[in-house]
Amino acid sequence: MPMSRPDSAVSLLPDYSLRAHNTFGFDARARVAARIGSPGQFASLARDPRVAGLDRLVLGGGSNVVFTRDFDGLVLLDEIRGRALVREDDGAWYVEAGGGENWHAFVEWTLAEGMPGLENLALIPGTVGAAPIQNIGAYGLEMKEHFASLRAVELATGELVEFDAARCAFGYRDSFFKRDGRGRFAIVAVTFRLPKAWTPRIGYADVARELAARGIDARAARARDVFDAVVAIRRAKLPDPLALGNAGSFFKNPVIDAQAFAALRAREPDIVSYPQPDGRVKLAAGWLIDRCGWKGRALGAAAVHERQALVLVNLGGASGADVLALAHAIRRDVLGRFGVELEMEPVCL
């Protein structure tokens, strides 16, 4: 797969502003930063005496991080580019992309190349390298369903390591890289398996409604139709981070057991829920937050978005600590009313 630039000595950027590298727009600073354009550059920094002993943080699009303070260490800006069809067989295409590739642009490229499958994940902010960490998902599809493998550099040793799905240990918005592997690896390339036998994934009512509004029979929808519908839905519901700082969905949709759900539904008959294959029930976190009266409310310059209660926004001048205080207030109220604990999606530093 082509990389954006060859291995070369890495220039260090002292006292580096991270404002442009996090979608909340927080003006945190790194003690030192480095732009990384190849796996070899990640590896070279493992042995570089200039940064020995420093904590390390890999940043892609910065769409899943909340800086509550400056980062007193080395920030590695993943700019590894490249995307290609690496092989195919009778059943599927295998496509690989660099960790620094923009996720949405990569999804659009797969469709332009006639390889559908990722269209439900359109317009999710961030990079290809961040997608496995979070096991991103939307509108009835999780990334893990099309994941084949990834390559990552172990930051402490510079070793290039291959991960299959089992080793990644994917869960709901979760993976090995958010648990035991947190902070240990930089994902430099991801390979996806896109089956040639494609059918539209249109189980979510929002997608079916958007297709109908466009005069498209859901059963005959093409991948591009689904892509366009998802993009339209997300643009209508979610603020553009360039206009209003945010990190997308701030809370995971909680999953509870059937007994707890039955008791909750007895008190809240109109609660929004989604039965899971294992018998548990997923709740809509946005609905819980809205019912607690938080939609559209602000604490200082941090606020809950007026159209989507799952999204916390920076109205201008908010700090990471302000957003975190708002998140804690929301979690407290949801727990008090529903007995359900919300888990935050972004990493707070």
UniProtKB/Swiss-Prot annotation:
Gene3D superfamilies, A to Z: 3.30.465.10, UDP-N-acetylenolpyruvoylglucosamine reductase, C-terminal domain, Uridine Diphospho-n-acetylenolpyruvylglucosamine Reductase, domain 2
Domain FAD-binding PCMH-type: 26-197
Pathway given in the UniProt record: Cell wall biogenesis; peptidoglycan biosynthesis
Swiss-Prot/TrEMBL keywords: Cell cycle, Cell division, Cell shape, Cell wall biogenesis/degradation, Cytoplasm, FAD, Flavoprotein, NADP, Oxidoreductase, Peptidoglycan synthesis
GO molecular-function term, one example from the UniProt record: FAD binding
Localization, UniProt: Cytoplasm
Keyword Hydrolase attributed: no
Highest taxon, organism lineage: Bacteria
Cofactor(s), names only, from the UniProt record: FAD
Gene Ontology terms describing biological process: cell division; cell wall organization; peptidoglycan biosynthetic process; regulation of cell shape
EC annotation from Swiss-Prot or TrEMBL: 1.3.1.98
Biological role: Cell wall formation.
This protein's name: UDP-N-acetylenolpyruvoylglucosamine reductase
